[in-house]
């Protein structure tokens, strides 16, 4: 179940499939080695990306500035980086889905 992220020297890169315009922010599972995340914001003017980063920060208990969109600014397939110290909380997410 942890195939959706990889650990580098100082960060964890999370592979995400985002579903904007959803009724609420929530994790829906892991499919095709990506963490599936429903996002309540629309995919316009970076609103969904900001909402996704904020949701991840809140869930992991880190600052919003620690969640960085690495790839996929205009795509549903995204890569997000968080500091490596949050890897255990990230593993816990999959146990809750």
What name fits each language-model region?
Residues 74-76:
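Short acidic/glycine-enriched loop/turn segments that link adjacent beta-strands
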Residues 1-53, 62, 68-69, 78-97:
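Contiguous, often N-terminal, cationic amphipathic patches that form binding interfaces
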Residues 59:
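C-terminal catalytic core of tyrosine-transesterase DNA break-rejoin enzymes
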